[in-house]
A protein has these predicted regions:
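Hydrophobic/aromatic residues within well-ordered alpha-helical segments
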Residues: 21, 64, 75-79, 94, ...
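Helix-loop "lid/cap" segments that line or gate small-molecule binding pockets
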Residues: 103-110, 118-126, 213-217
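Amphipathic, non-transmembrane alpha-helical scaffold segments
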Residues: 18, 26, 72, 132, ...
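Amphipathic alpha-helical packing segments from all-alpha helical-bundle domains
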Residues: 96, 107, 111, 116, ...
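C-terminal peripheral helix-coil segments that are non-catalytic and often amphipathic
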Residues: 1-12, 96, 100, 104, ...
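Amphipathic alpha-helical linker/stalk segments
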Residues: 69-101, 107-109, 113, 117, ...
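Basic, helix-initiating cap at the start of DNA-binding domains
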Residues: 1-36, 40-52, 59-66, 92
Length: 226
């Protein structure tokens, strides 16, 4: 009996390994950026963790800054198209959309290692203006635009009061920044279950913050909604 190779089988193992290297390097870099920060991460340590040489890393990423940019694009920036498509297709109320978006953000970003990128930029952005400017362009600006679309939807449909949307954006962002900073600072020191615990369940926190925010935004009979 003749066994025919599949297309995948015909690809040399070394070539398959080569194709996987950028992803392996970005995974290693993400872990180290979150653990040690941008300044504390050395490219040779990234290469070692990925199981390749420093020279191999530079074949794919010419500098640590370019490696950082690739990590951000891979783990955060690439999701904005998906989220905008979801917004376009959403059939529920805008209050339901806000709850959905905040919980989805936690599941896709907040609960993953990628959330540590935000803490890194907030901590080290002033020292590395190039990565701060990149993060603003690739994450903050499209993120703000997406949130503004959500809030505008509510105003246009008569569900939300006509507030200053440019500032209302930060009412949604602030709880997310808080829970990220908590996760990567105090949370490891405050295990869940301790009596008098200070730890916070992220999903409960996000749902509660969304509820408080929406009660402030929603049009209510008998209240000055202007």
């Amino acid at each position: 009996m003749v066994i025919c190779d599949t297309p995948a089988d015909k690809q040399p193992r070394r070539e398959r390994r080569k194709d996987a290297r950028p992803g392996e390097l970005m995974d290693a870099a993400l872990s180290l950026f979150v653990e040690k920060g941008f300044a504390g991460t050395r490219v040779e340590d990234v290469a070692m963790r990925a199981g390749v040489s420093k020279g191999t890393l530079f074949l794919y990423f010419p500098s640590k800054v370019e490696l950082f940019k690739a990590v951000v694009r891979e783990n955060i920036t690439g999701r904005f198209n998906e989220w905008n498509t979801t917004l376009d297709a959403f059939q529920g109320t805008t209050s339901e959309l806000v709850h959905y978006c905040m919980q989805q953000w936690w599941e896709r970003i907040g609960a993953t290692q990628a959330s540590g990128i935000t803490k890194l930029v907030m901590s080290e952005g002033a020292l590395f203006p190039e990565i701060a400017a990149f993060y603003r362009q690739e994450v903050i600006e499209p993120g703000n635009a997406l949130i503004r679309r959500v809030l505008s939807r509510g105003v246009d449909r008569g569900e939300f009061r006509p507030v200053n949307l440019d500032y209302a954006i930060y009412s949604l962002i602030s709880p997310m920044i808080f829970i990220i900073m908590w996760k990567h600072s105090m949370a490891p020191c405050c295990p869940m279950g301790d009596e008098g615990q200070l730890n916070i369940d992220p999903q409960t926190f996000i749902a509660n913050q969304a509820d408080i925010l929406l009660n402030g935004l929603s049009v209510c009979p008998g209240r000055n909604n202007a």
